[in-house]
């Protein structure tokens, strides 16, 4: 697989860009403890490129991070047999806010951390049930504003239902709700899977993180957050869309900090 990026400022004679870091899910990202990879400029052109091998089944996202610096990462990242994990994470943490999506890739959005990403899948990537029917009709979700007395803040919450109204419907809580509501709307996928009988009719609650600071504070194992959800939010949701109180009929889904939650 070859990645290409064109420097808007032109060649090395007119541009200040020294690196174009490539952040690829599961390949060069901070979870892999892999040395950072930069595209290389083709001399005397505005073209940068990087080539790597990918599994035929791979699917994920990627982004470019142009930089005017040669040394965005500490030297410990490039020394020894393995990069220093903490130094690697710190380097990516500083760089990711400056990430850009691929301007030639129409399938681009803002990822869960708020930075731009683009989609990529190899020819043998497995089918994604539900997502392969984007035109499935669905009932429009309701967006409310939750004012939390315990957390002393307010945020958006989306309530989405499938099937007929019933107090026995399961409950699914999706963290990073703004991502699944706006960046990558999950509604048609859930509706499709429900229509096919692969998911039961359910009540879905998508909780906004407000911003990255609140996400970092509230999601990783924060009992106050969950007490607020349980005591404040869910009773409000239940008055609008009845659902079952049974633990075995309840799902909480999240990724990264949401997974820790």
Residue spans for each PLM region:
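Aromatic-rich carbohydrate-binding modules that target alpha-glucans
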Residues: 2-57, 67-128
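Short, hydrophobic/aromatic-rich segments at coil-to-beta transitions
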Residues: 47, 135-145
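Alpha/beta-hydrolase fold nucleophile elbow
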Residues: 243-256
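Short beta-strand element of the alpha/beta-hydrolase
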Residues: 158-161, 167-178
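Short beta-strand elements bearing conserved aromatic residues within extracellular beta-rich modules
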Residues: 20-22, 62, 157
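Cap/lid segment of the alpha/beta-hydrolase catalytic domain
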Residues: 173-242
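Short beta-strand segments enriched for Tyr within beta-sheet-rich domains
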Residues: 58-66, 159, 169, 225, ...
